[in-house]
Amino acid sequence: DVCSSDLFKHILSQVVFKAKTEYDNMQVNIKDIKIFNVKMGGVYTLPATADGTGSWAVGDWPESSTGGGFITVVQGKFIEVNSNTTATDISEKTPMLNIPQKLTAWKVSEEATNTKIKADGAHQCYLSITCKIQQSGVYLLGSADSYGAIYVPFGDTWVAGKRHIYTLIFGGGYTDQGEA
């Protein structure tokens, strides 16, 4: 029997993305977004008592040539972002549920981690965004026929039972070599 005093405590973190542009004359068409260098598994220990708190033991880094796992936020969606005032929903209708963990942002300004490959080796987190960016009709990234990739440092602490909402503001980013 479940009574009204029983509370459900969610053990995962909910993550949602939205996007807008930095300038009103900018248009972005997003194809894919991935979060790199996140831990992909762990063990959750249930609380010993009904009013207790469980705990996570997050696993080791996945074995891969990229240094860590990645989470796909959107894939093949072709989301159009064309406002610098109203954020466009990317994943609110399909939020991600992830293992609570600390994400260390890619430190682009440091020599030891100034490229994407070095960031992977140090397990520093970033977003990989495949998109087209236009400003006043001129392509800044990609073309009418192709998409380009930008990388954005991404760090936070995902807390169990909490909803984390991120609004991406397109107007910058880095190449895989850490160049703005």
Q: Across the structure, where does each feature detected by a protein language model lie?
A:
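Extracytoplasmic cysteine-anchoring/structural motifs
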Residues: D1-A180
